[in-house]
């Protein structure tokens, strides 16, 4: 019998991102209770020695499974150390890989309160509204002018600790362009 290969998309991440992600998920499962119904599977509970953790997030009849891996091939940089993340959407026997942005949108849709378009009308009528989104990683689009005005009026409040974002987990913070802190003066006087 010949070998059968299965190909899947795995995002390379550094190990500190994986540790932070797991800590945030556990905090919101057990302390803040915002992640109700989520299931965390440890590395010793799986048959695959490459899996470091699995998080099962129910989405109605379907579920989102976020698997973190260790011991993969060495990464492009020394700090990657062969760590990776795969994101899978499952419903019945159907499975498909999805990207981090879509995963964040699905989590946002099912689990967290958000400012909706009808909230502008509710605010104008004097009814109470939810003026903020609990999970802003779930939608990146620019809001309407009314939404932006209401946000400016209410103000943005930071959450501690933040809610776990799949996009934040998979982003490559090491290969982003460096921001120059001081633009005053010429480059020659700043020693650049």
Curated annotation (Swiss-Prot):
Swiss-Prot/TrEMBL site (Cleavage in virion (by viral protease)) positions: 150-151
Location of the motif HCCH motif: 108-139
Main location: host cell
Region feature Interaction with host APOBEC3F and APOBEC3G, mapped onto this chain: 54-72
Residues modified to Phosphoserine: 144, 165
Compartment list: Host cytoplasm; Host cell membrane; Virion
Gene Ontology cellular-component annotations: host cell cytoplasm; host cell plasma membrane; membrane; virion component
Domain of life, source organism: Viruses
UniProt cross-references to Pfam families, sorted A to Z: Vif
Stretches for region Interaction with host APOBEC3F: 14-17, 74-79
Topology in the lipid bilayer: Peripheral membrane protein
Region of interest (SOCS box-like), ranges: 151-180
Record-level Gene Ontology MF annotations: metal ion binding; RNA binding
Note: Vif-defective viruses show catastrophic failure in reverse transcription due to APOBEC-induced mutations that initiate a DNA base repair pathway and compromise the structural integrity of the ssDNA. In the absence of Vif, the virion is morphologically abnormal.
Biological function: Counteracts the innate antiviral activity of host APOBEC3F and APOBEC3G by promoting their ubiquitination and degradation. Acts as a substrate recognition component of an E3 ubiquitin-protein ligase complex: mechanistically, Vif hijacks a host cullin-5-RING E3 ubiquitin-protein ligase complex (ECS complex) and the transcription coactivator CBFB/CBF-beta to form an active E3 ubiquitin-protein ligase complex that targets APOBEC3G and APOBEC3F for polyubiquitination, leading to their degradation by the proteasome.
Name the record gives this protein: Virion infectivity factor
Gene (UniProt): vif
